[in-house]
Amino acid sequence: MEDTILIRNEENCKKNEKENKNDLTDKMLKTRTVIICGEINQELAEKVTKQLLLLQEMGDEPITLFINSQGGHVEAADTIHDIIKFIKPQVNIIGTGWVASAGITIYLAAEKENRYSLPNTRYMIHQPLGGFRGQATDIGI
């Protein structure tokens, strides 16, 4: 009997966590706020793209985007950068914590007058990294 109650309580907790997460997302959309936190990857780019496109459909009022990221996948950051430039509403970007590497690409998508920084924000920009591997004959192709 105790095991059954415990399982039900765990299921209720998971259900409540999901409902709370949905409530928070709804509140963020109502206030036209997007948060980018952590590693930038394809999954994050898809999520942010959906949010920005949805906010554009909801109206032309400015969107506030908070960013705290040490970087990640360059092409994912390029996607977010391009969407910010593409949508009609003004996007105000606020840097907090670290804004580095691929995160800088996103931060720079806002017009200069729409970029803000909290007092303890640190920025880091570097040259793109890349390279080739393989047989010299294959690389020469």
Region annotations inferred by a language model:
Residues M1-I141:
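Terminal-region recognition feature
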